[in-house]
Amino acid sequence: MRINHNIAALNTLNRLSSNNSASQKNMEKLSSGLRINRAGDDAAGLAISEKMRGQIRGLEMASKNSQDGISLIQTAEGALTETHAILQRVRELVVQAGNTGTQDKATDLQSIQDEISALTDEIDGISNRTEFNGKKLLDGTYKVDTATPANQKNLVFQIGANATQQISVNIEDMGADALGIKEADGSIAALHSVNDLDVTKFADNAADTADIGFDAQLKVVDEAINQVSSQRAKLGAVQNRLEHTINNLSASGENLTAAESRIRDVDMAKEMSEFTKNNILSQASQAMLAQANQQPQNVLQLLR
């Protein structure tokens, strides 16, 4: 029996230190709720988890971007709803003015024309005033530019967490000039061109086919209505796409969060079981260390 080195006590002390260290790690994981609190806990798992976290946050921001895109489209579409209503009223007035058999050109047609002029001015007003976060939406800033594609401006929405996951939207000029109601210089053009509506020029001849006649001007209004309808349909399609995009982003984010949780989050029941085991082993080690420290004293029995 040796008394200078208590090997049993040293071995027991090592076990006690190991059990205490394991218990501390168990408590850290239980208190944080995370299985990986530092790279040393699981280096590969930490790297994968951080990549997933980046993707999750990217998906969340992409969903917000899509929501903002829907808000922009709703702003533009709401303005075009009013433009549609104005054009329907203009068409109604043109049809009314076409009843030249009962209209007086000097008074009745001029009154109708005054209202038409006011309405077309408001179409321009809507086009110039409709904005979203400082961006004018309906004045042609973001229209398709086939003449100079290099100068094309698009409304770009980042709808994914990674590069090249964007959609571009164009909105045509919805001003009165572009809708075929009037030209910038106010001139009367050919039937296929943009026209100024001027019902005071309607002739009494029902067979009139001139560019300033009833048929020509009514066709201009109908074309304007069709242009607005087409633009609203395109915006509606983009809005529907963005709504589906949001649903997909939500599902992807949910699945990725669940996967990241399985890597990084702690299994509370399992970890509590491990903590209980290590705590019991620590207490047992303390008791055995006390016993090991008593062994050298037994040498005194040999000296009696």
UniProtKB/Swiss-Prot annotation:
> What are the inducing conditions?
Under positive control of SigD. Repressed by CsrA; repression is greater in the 1A96 than 168 genetic background and higher in minimal than rich medium.
The entry lists its GO molecular-function terms as: structural molecule activity
Keyword Secreted set for record? yes
From the record, give the cysteines joined by S-S bonds: none
Does the keyword Cell inner membrane feature in the UniProt annotation? no
Identify the domain of life.
Answer: Bacteria
Keywords recorded for this protein, A-Z: Bacterial flagellum, Cell wall, Secreted
According to the UniProt record, one GO cellular component term is: extracellular region
Q: Which InterPro entries match?
A: Flagellin (IPR001492), Flagellin_C (IPR046358), Flagellin_N (IPR001029)
Q: Where found?
A: Secreted; Bacterial flagellum; Secreted, Cell wall
Pfam families, per the entry: Flagellin_C, Flagellin_N
This protein's assembly is summarised as:
Interacts with FliW in a 1:1 complex. Forms a 3-way complex of Hag, FliS and FliW, in which Flis and FliW do not directly interact.
Protein family per UniProt: Belongs to the bacterial flagellin family.
Q: Which PANTHER family match?
A: FLAGELLIN (PTHR42792:SF2)
The record describes the protein's role as: Flagellin is the subunit which polymerizes to form the filaments of bacterial flagella. Assembly into flagella requires FliW. Acts as a homeostatic autoinhibitory regulator to control its own cytoplasmic levels. Partner switching by flagellin between FliW and CsrA provides a flagellar assembly checkpoint to tightly control the timing of flagellin synthesis. Flagellin binds to assembly factor FliW, freeing translation regulator CsrA to repress translation of the flagellin mRNA.
What protein name is recorded for this chain? Answer: Flagellin
Organism whose genome encodes this protein: Bacillus subtilis (strain 168)
Q: What is the lineage of its organism?
A: Bacteria, Bacillati, Bacillota, Bacilli, Bacillales
